[in-house]
């Protein structure tokens, strides 16, 4: 993992020649985490948009009606086991001095998320811009993404799932209004 520890990992190999191939962990791990959270809560929704890696096409066309009762979004599409996105393409995902972040910060740190980064785009940015709510994007336990050496660390996926559960319990069903200031160079609206 990111700390150099040996952990149980999932990796894919080609059937025809036994060589490593990409596992698609950057998508699959995040989807798995969301499915686990859907089993733990009866008051949350999941949104699985298409074509994130070619311009967040699904999020750009997200149905406003679906998001009318959404108070915030948590995405699991950051690398490794200790990262989260502070901003995506220069667009901040939440206000640092907000109740949203103040309630969450300790929980985030307790789960080992200590590398807070400025990342390229992912769906949380588009949803925040489009629907004016605060978002997080957390590590999903995948490493060496988009390469034949990609792998997923099981313990890291479990930690991210537990992080999501703790945050949902703490943040509850409140609406955390946030309209990001879009960097005009990157704004999609």
Question: Can you say where each PLM-predicted feature lies in the sequence?
Answer:
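A gly/proline- and charged-residue-enriched helix-loop-helix capping module
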Residues: 13-21
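His/Asp/Glu-rich mid-to-C-terminal helical/loop segments that flank catalytic regions of hydrolases
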Residues: 144-189
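Catalytic-loop motifs flanking and including active-site residues across diverse enzymes
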Residues: 26-33, 100, 123, 156, ...
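Generic secondary-structure signature for well-ordered alpha-helical cores
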Residues: 39-43, 52, 106-113, 129-132, ...
């Amino acid at each position: 993992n990111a700390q150099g520890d040996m952990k149980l990992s999932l990796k894919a190999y080609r059937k025809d020649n036994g060589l490593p191939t990409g596992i698609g962990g950057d998508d699959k791990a995040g989807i798995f985490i969301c499915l686990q959270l859907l089993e733990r809560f009866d008051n949350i929704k999941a949104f699985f948009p298409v074509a994130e890696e070619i311009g967040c096409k699904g999020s750009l066309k997200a149905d406003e009606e679906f998001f009318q009762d959404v108070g915030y979004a948590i995405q699991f599409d950051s690398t490794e086991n200790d990262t989260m996105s502070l901003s995506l393409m220069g667009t901040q995902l939440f206000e640092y001095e907000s109740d949203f972040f103040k309630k969450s910060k300790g929980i985030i740190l307790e789960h080992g998320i200590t590398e807070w980064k400025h990342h390229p785009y992912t769906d949380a940015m588009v949803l925040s811009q489009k629907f004016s709510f605060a978002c997080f994007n957390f590590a999903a336990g995948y490493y060496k993404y988009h390469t034949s050496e990609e792998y997923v660390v099981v313990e890291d996926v479990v930690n991210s799932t537990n992080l999501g559960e703790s945050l949902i319990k703490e943040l509850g069903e409140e609406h955390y209004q946030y309209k990001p200031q879009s960097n005009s160079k990157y704004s999609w609206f």
